[in-house]
């Protein structure tokens, strides 16, 4: 090959990997893959058995590889029950979070083995891997096979690119996202919370080390700076601004250019044409709602309807049959007998429309929707800010908790605690957001919507950066040349000792240069003068 005959942007095989993650994890990755395919690259998809449907709607995916078994219904329910029971305010609740993560990561050995077998075959070896955060076996594949990698994160990685003005554990703070308005006591509490989390994750760390040891691999310490491309599906304005290394870029919100229109669901379209102040309620496909929480939610929504702050409720809720039985047997429901729960859940109340599935983006984009009561999952958060809908946040676990705080800090929502909220609190928050007496919520919603719209084009930057890293990696060395150059986007301090990268050796020389003459003068003055 000569420089003159080489292509500037040759087509390559790119493997997208999503394992225990679901639609929220796969959708932004596949949207970036769509852009890469339009540039001539071949796209293949690796997933767990049963998740092939994530990729089948996308004609650009040329092949689907199964790299692990599916999660059973029982395992799925047990996992998300653990997440729902997790609570950062007590030791057992914190341990519950890491027990749930252990279940997620128990798929690592199987996916690692199968991915290793896949990339070992020259017929399927990819030129680049684009992986979901939860498919962390891809990092080991990168290290072992020297295949360049990009990892998609729904928020800024917790341990990468730390900043002194961001207290505690980023993404897992108790109260403050930055130190700007935090008191000294607040910051001390955040640091103490980090110690609590470290103690709670002890079994999780030992579990990971045991798995890796059984596979013949050593521990993999998290880097302060990545040695792979990190694509963060978020943006500054929602995230706290901070300096980032070249291999970390915010690319969110990554959303498809089109979405399913409302005319595919005539009953919802008719409802929105009749009602003009509708709150949309959705808690995702994995959040289980206990009867007491449903009762408070419905009671709060009924109060908001009675006060006139809203005139309709659209609730996306697939599995509500079991909750209906629990509500009927719940003794606390006697206190609010005037609320006809069965009529509401059976869609016999004109103010409510409860359906198993909705075209969410079309709902949020409709002018009749004035509020979104959400669990603040990654997709839901991005769609809410992009379509300009204020949020009553009721996060449950993981990045949802941070997203709830971020929406409130950005002035586009109010955050509630799922463990102890009341119906009166919910109706009061709806009133505050809808009436918006100072106009601050409307102003901030529009502000953040415009920022999100501008940043939504950064998915093309993600594709650019993938090509950049991929082309750089394949020409860093050759069979003829032993010398290999480092990644062009990796800062040199990542390959240096902490001592040298911080110039401590240089400072020691300065101290010596100052101390020796001073010491000599003092010795001379004490002994000769």
Swiss-Prot record:
InterPro entries: UDP-glycosyltransferase (IPR050271), UDP_glucos_trans (IPR002213), UDP_glycos_trans_CS (IPR035595)
Keyword Glycosyltransferase: yes
Catalytic activity: stromemycin aglycone + UDP-alpha-D-glucose = stromemycin + UDP + H(+)
Gene Ontology, cellular component aspect: membrane
Membrane topology label: Single-pass membrane protein
SUPFAM superfamilies, per the entry: UDP-Glycosyltransferase/glycogen phosphorylase
Pathway given in the UniProt record: Mycotoxin biosynthesis
Residues modified by glycosylation: 70, 420
Family as reported in the entry's similarity comment: Belongs to the glycosyltransferase 28 family.
PANTHER family linked to this entry: EG:EG0003.4 PROTEIN-RELATED, FI06409P-RELATED
Name of the protein: UDP-glycosyltransferase
Top-level taxonomy: Eukaryota, Fungi, Dikarya, Ascomycota, Pezizomycotina
